[in-house]
Amino acid sequence: MEELLPDGQIWANMDPEERMLAAATAFTHICAGQGEGDVRREAQSIQYDPYSKASVAPGKRPALPVQLQYPHVESNVPSETVSEASQRLRKPVMKRKVLRRKPDGEVLVTDESIISESESGTENDQDLWDLRQRLMNVQFQEDKESSFDVSQKFNLPHEYQGISQDQLICSLQREGMGSPAYEQDLIVASRPKSFILPKLDQLSRNRGKTDRVARYFEYKRDWDSIRLPGEDHRKELRWGVREQMLCRAEPQSKPQHIYVPNNYLVPTEKKRSALRWGVRCDLANGVIPRKLPFPLSPS
């Protein structure tokens, strides 16, 4: 039994790219009808929804925007068909239209009305399950086909060609031959990236905790290994100072000063004043000089 798509095409006669496009289009239609797929808006609505107070039926989840834009996939089904299908399945509780402007100036109007739960959920769930299975099969086939493209893109050696993407990442990380910092660098450029994958070399859970003793010994090891030019070893310097302090050498005797009398006489009137003092003393005591210094003239 051949499976027919809504536009009349046969699933078995389609190329892998056409299968991927058709499955993504149908999956988008179902998700838009059920209000699934917008993870960021669901998280925001769970945290705080400023329009929840004005809603008639509390506890309802917002639907996906009716008009969706994809960078690589162009949908042939107009947005009016999606809106009509979603309106038939669900009854809107509160209408909300949002106008957004893109960096290139294009205006995008989306209908983010809050809708009620579906009455025919079992049929849609079954269709959603089938589409998910088809998407998984198509993606698995693309992974097999893209393994050769990845090896040709990065010019890998012959021993790494023909292996899967996960094995290639593990091998590059284990052997340390310049593996990229992020895993999405190995993903084919044509495949859309929904989010930034974490680094391959994840830190441990206890990365916030630090051992002070280990950090001290790490700094001490770095200090001992890296030294400034001309710097003395601290341990040798301390032992040298300690030896000098313990050494008790005999104190050297200071040279004694030899006193030499000074007989120098300054040329002044000391002799004349001494002579005058002696004459005065002789006159006071009535002592006649023994010899006159000059001869007496006859009168």
Swiss-Prot record:
Keywords: Cell projection, Ciliopathy, Cilium biogenesis/degradation, Cytoplasm, Cytoskeleton, Disease variant, Phosphoprotein. The keyword Ribonucleoprotein does not apply. It comes from the Eukaryota. Disulfide bonds: none annotated. One of its GO terms (biological process) is cilium assembly. One of its GO terms (cellular component) is centriole. InterPro entries: Centriolar_ciliogenesis_assoc, HYLS1, HYLS1_C_dom. Its main location: cytoplasm. The modification Phosphoserine is found at residue 179. It is found in: Cytoplasm; Cell projection, Cilium; Cytoplasm, Cytoskeleton, Microtubule organizing center, Centrosome; Cytoplasm, Cytoskeleton, Microtubule organizing center, Centrosome, Centriole. The keyword tRNA-binding does not apply. Belongs to the HYLS1 family. It is linked to Hydrolethalus syndrome 1: A lethal syndrome characterized by polydactyly, central nervous system malformation, and hydrocephalus. The polydactyly is postaxial in the hands and preaxial in the feet. A highly characteristic hallux duplex is seen in almost no other situation. In half of the cases, a large atrioventricular communis defect of the heart is found. The pregnancy is characterized by hydramnios, which is often massive, and by preterm delivery. Plays a role in ciliogenesis. PANTHER family: CENTRIOLAR AND CILIOGENESIS-ASSOCIATED PROTEIN HYLS1 (PTHR34174:SF1), HYDROLETHALUS SYNDROME PROTEIN 1 (PTHR34174). This is Centriolar and ciliogenesis-associated protein HYLS1. It comes from Homo sapiens (Human).
